[in-house]
Amino acid sequence: MTLKEEFIKLGYTEEDYEIIRNNYAVNQIKDETLIKKLKDNFAFLLKMGYTKEEVVKMTKSSPSIYGLSKENIKQKIKDMNTLGYTKEEVIKMTKSLPQIYSYSIENMKQKIEDMITLGYTKEEVIKMTKNSPSIYSYSIETIKQKIEDMITLGYTKEEVVKMTKGIPIIYSLSIENMKQKIEDIISLGYTKEEVIKMTKSLPSIYSLSIESIKQKIDGMIALGYTKEEVIKMTKTLPAIYGLSIENMRQKIEDIISLGYTKEEVIKMTKILPSIYGYSIENMRQKIEDIISLGYTKEEVIKMTKGLPT
């Protein structure tokens, strides 16, 4: 069986084969040698916990995996264990960034050190790279430039560091896309200053499409709010954009079960949007606590209708 046939047998297309075979990392390897590496590494990666489809996808993206020995791969996992990752985390990270197997552990250590100089702790860098392994593919100059670009948008360096701790994928967004997102949100009824403030509190807004944001507004209008009220509420509690409309409906139903009408719940959440962030158990407990002070449940309900805070 030819090398191409061996690849196709494992699930690659002819186009996949050409891409891999012509890659600089393996194009000097003889066919018979590459056949052995193909079989050995493919089987080894399956044994490590990847699916057949994942191995195909990974090696198309990073053909150099077929230039590595099984010992190289095992050693990389061990080295990453010493950095603070578990084997399972390494497997997950390399599914999205298989090039990690080709990075030297010294370069990875240096990237961690460089990130620490920007204001992160080692633990934060490890956590960030678990969520966004692509950070390892960026030069420290690129990361510094992203911070500088975000400062020009209206953030401080400290705010950028804080935002990227929670949503490290921000480093993978182009500054042009971020500017466009700000413009798109402004077109919905916010000011630039309000968008900047909202994204400080909820950086994941940058990962939402403008269509998703518009859909959330439409969904909330269907619940009983006006567009203007949604805009006002999300200025106060941008985390609303991180909630599903189904969860919001359920929260309304749960609060109705406590003794309120739907209209009253809508009115209360206009005044205090953060109600959507409360668990129904905590709300029940608060009612019980106030009752223990000498009020009836009906009195508590009446009081909180007018003053939900």
Residue ranges, per PLM feature:
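Long amphipathic alpha-helical repeat/alpha-solenoid cores
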Residues: 1-309
